[in-house]
């Protein structure tokens, strides 16, 4: 099984001091870049222009976490902007296997995100094209929500699945 990676989110960063905020996390494995479209979640956050600014300001690889409706149609925007990894929600993707394969063919690591209520067994048919799995501890949307118990249960049940195919974070 892959190792645990540290990926601080820029969602709570001081955007007026983005470079300084990114300098503080220079030793992280990834910068976690939350993208919310106001449809899949009730909130609206960053687009590709901010991702480009992040990429210009740090050497830390960027994981674009797409909390959007129809991520299959938008992954190329974030790949073109320089995302090193793109994670899409299982619950939002119509053609998940195709989207993950497409990302990998472009040289972008492909991740899948599961909401707290989604069973981990849904990964069985796509695990061969998954570089990373993110188990949400809260329902997607706003920051500072109460932690859900579901992810710890999902993590325990995901171990056999992840062990069957080596994950590549």
Where would I find each of the regions flagged by the language model?
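Glycine/threonine-rich flexible loop motifs
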Residues: 143-147
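Short glycine-rich anion-binding loops that position phosphate/pyrophosphate groups of nucleotides
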Residues: 138-140
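Internal catalytic-core helix/loop-beta-alpha segment
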Residues: 109-113, 117
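Short loop/turn elements that flank and shape the SAM/SAH-binding pocket of Class I
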Residues: 120
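Conserved N-terminal beta1-alpha1 strand-loop-helix module at the mouth
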Residues: 1-87, 91-98, 102-105, 109-110, ...
